[in-house]
Amino acid sequence: VGPGWMNKMGRWEQPYELLYKSYSDGCAYYGKLKKEGQLIDMTMSEFADYYREKKGVNDNNYNEPECALWRDILYGSDKQLFWYCDPYMRACVNMDQGGAIVDLRPYAAKLEWPVGIGTKHVQDASYPFLIQEKYRAGYFTHYAGEGTVRSAKLSYKGEEVDLCLCPTHAHFSQEGKTRILTLDPVTIEFRDLTVKLQTKEYFEEGSSNIKIERNILEMSDPTAEVTLNEYMVACYGTTEYSEDMSNITLKIDGPEEKEIHYAYKCREEGVVGAKEVSAVIPEIETRVSMTASDETAEGYVKEGYAFSPMFTLGYRKTISDKEVFAT
């Protein structure tokens, strides 16, 4: 909220008098607290200095994350988002899309990103993303191909369901230095099979790791097997358009090594038993990788093309009732 709320040009739903009173009352309340010594007002630079001191940044021991499990109360949608931010990354998990990661920024690179007249970024002060749902469309993409998102798909007898289509809610907890997001189970219905699945997401302090665990709680046919495809579609940039990805290298480490040097040719490689799949993005000094809890899973990498330029890292695994698979 700022003084712009008090303009008289009819931009807001409320009348000017109400907006003026609301803003004035707010300022008066903060002023009263300041006079009583209960509040200190700071510029953003002053607050940054205060934050660094309080969090231990100045003593080189800053690992503690900021965590916020947010629920929409303004519009009554009952949607939930979870924000996680530490010196290594910022991530956003969207429970309305089944616990998909819809924003991911690799702070570990600590990029020098000068902004202003005379620099490469005259106005754009955003830190580059690997995943950004709003700019790169997420699951509900507006062009051919997939938008950036970290999610999973379940397949059975030719049918496929993405967990992005399974809204749910989550509960936050902490064990030691690991923050845990436990999602309510979702039910996936195929033509002749029903699967009840629960997701847990683990954020380990100071590690730059996110572990996503899928637990098959129940199947209508206990003998059935479904294919789980854990995937991450990503690119890099700060706007709706990804930057030039020609220098990106996609790699599979395992019994057999595979590499794709990005050329927008829509190529794909896969290796059963892959130890790791990864992408190196030199322009933002970032390496992002995925590993699997089961050595029999197939790791794969996919290259994009001009009109759907994002790369994909993923693991495919056949799973059955009561099985747990983590990446």
Question: Which stretches of residues belong to each language-model region?
Answer:
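Catalytic grooves of carbohydrate-active enzymes
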Residues: 1-49, 295-325
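Beta-strand-rich recognition/accessory modules
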Residues: 1-2, 116-119, 182-187, 211, ...
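C-terminal regulatory/interaction regions
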Residues: 36-39, 80, 187
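Surface beta-strand/loop "capping" patches
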Residues: 52-93
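Short, exposed beta-strand/loop patches in secreted or surface proteins that constitute
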Residues: 72-75, 82, 164-176, 201-203, ...
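Short, acidic/polar N-cap/turn motifs at the starts of alpha helices
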Residues: 79-83, 169, 178, 247, ...
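Acidic-aromatic substrate-binding/catalytic surfaces of carbohydrate-active enzymes
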Residues: 90-189
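Acidic (Asp/Glu-rich), glycine- and aromatic
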Residues: 103-107, 186-197, 205-254
